[in-house]
């Protein structure tokens, strides 16, 4: 059984006991989080069912930052160069339960 959930503007295909790295959520380590925007749900035979009232429960493993990306801007022959780095805040979740409320 798997579910497709949306959080942080991205979609993730998750099963129970999966570990996923998503955009930052305001939750502390060890706290239970519910992801209620479930787009699709699949049963044991991988038959996809589109449902509106399924809930995915996950626990927060860690709050961390992603790898650094470099943003480099340049205009040729004008001596214009800018270099910036960015590290996005991320939340690591372990999916504990996929619950269909039907």
From Swiss-Prot:
Disulfide bonds: none
BP GO terms, sorted: translation
GO cellular component, one term: ribonucleoprotein complex
InterPro entries: bL21-like, bL21-like_sf, Ribosomal_bL21, Ribosomal_bL21_CS
Function: This protein binds to 23S rRNA in the presence of protein L20.
NCBIfam families: L21
Protein name: Large ribosomal subunit protein bL21
């Amino acid at each position: 059984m798997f579910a497709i959930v949306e959080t942080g503007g991205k979609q993730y295909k998750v099963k129970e006991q999966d570990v996923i790295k998503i955009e930052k959520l305001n939750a502390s380590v060890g706290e239970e989080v519910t992801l209620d925007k479930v787009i699709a749900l699949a049963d044991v035979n991988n038959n996809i069912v589109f449902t509106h009232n399924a809930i995915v429960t996950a626990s927060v493993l860690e709050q961390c930052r992603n790898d650094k990306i470099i943003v480099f801007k340049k205009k040729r022959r004008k001596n214009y160069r800018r270099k910036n780095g960015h590290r996005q805040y991320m939340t690591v979740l372990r999916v504990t339960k996929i619950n269909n409320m039907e």
